[in-house]
Amino acid sequence: MKVKASVKPICQKCKVVKRKGVVRVICQDPRHKQRQG
């Protein structure tokens, strides 16, 4: 899980999702997981 100020999709399968007011990127590749913070 990477914590970044600006989250961006890295590949085609990355999805930007908002959960409980937190912007996240979910992907099949676990290295692409990101959270805004």
Swiss-Prot record:
Keywords, sorted A to Z: Ribonucleoprotein, Ribosomal protein
What InterPro entries does the database record attribute to this sequence? Ribosomal_bL36, Ribosomal_bL36_sp
Q: Which GO terms describe its biological process?
A: translation
Respond yes or no to whether keyword Ribosomal protein is given for this record. yes
Q: Which GO terms describe its cellular component?
A: cytoplasm; ribonucleoprotein complex; ribosome
A Gene Ontology molecular function term of the record: structural constituent of ribosome
Answer yes or no on keyword Ribonucleoprotein. Answer: yes
Stored HAMAP family = Ribosomal_bL36
Q: Which family, according to the similarity comment?
A: Belongs to the bacterial ribosomal protein bL36 family.
**Which protein are we looking at?**
Large ribosomal subunit protein bL36
